[in-house]
Amino acid sequence: MTDYELYYWSVPFRGQFVRAVLAYADKTWTEGGDAAILKLMEGPVRKMPVPFMGPPLLIDKKADFAIAETPAIIHYLGETLDLMPATAALRAMTMKVVNDASDVIDDITLDGGREMWTKKRWQDFTPRLEKWMSLWEETGRRHGLKADWGYLLGGGEPGIADVVSATLWSTMTDRFEKIDAMLEETAPMTAALTRRVAELPSLAKLAAKAKQDYGDAYCGGQIEASLRKVLGD
């Protein structure tokens, strides 16, 4: 029996943060699948494992506990798998990074596809994306990050902040060359950290599985098609 059951769509996107933390912690999980997600979402709230509006949703089988919302899931995994930093300040910073990462992917999909990308919208958005990248760069700098060593919040080994950051940027830059070039120019230490952490065996294996399972898909749907159109990918 696997340790967890994860409900997320058949794309990387937001669910990849949860998958990455599970993989990094060497935990096993099954994926509920798109049909099961729709059935839960369209069914009565009283029958949901936990009241939720949309995935990701994670069920801890051993604990018989279900939780939704990406930051809440990652906080739960961090606490129960002993992956959180020792101090309250660094735990708070870890969750800030997780929430920032969630905000970035909301931005990159125009709040889940409420609008579609046009060249003008992308041009107007570029400074904001560069600012997001600079936030990562400055966070790392304040905690001793260098181009060839160190971690986002310091310490001697990768933490959740590093795993989530590497997943955010590598999933995006692997699929969009222009964003890759932007990250290299705007936040070179973050780009280097992303490569180092993404090359960890567990995360490299997960990325390879995502390519096998989802191809080049990022978030899917019309919003991804419009993003690829403005980026020329």
Q: Over which residues does each language-model region extend?
A:
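Basic/polar N-terminal segments that are highly enriched at the extreme N-terminus
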Residues: 1-3, 232-233
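GST-like domain detector, emphasizing the conserved glutathione-binding G-site
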Residues: 2-131
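Conserved alpha-helical elements of sugar-nucleotide-dependent glycosyltransferases
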Residues: 13-17, 189, 202
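Active-site-flanking alpha-helical
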Residues: 78, 169, 207
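GST-like fold's C-terminal all-alpha helical module
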Residues: 89, 96-199
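Exported/periplasmic ABC-transporter solute-binding proteins
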Residues: 203, 208-210
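Acidic/histidine-enriched, glycine/proline-rich intrinsically disordered or flexible terminal extensions
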Residues: 210-233
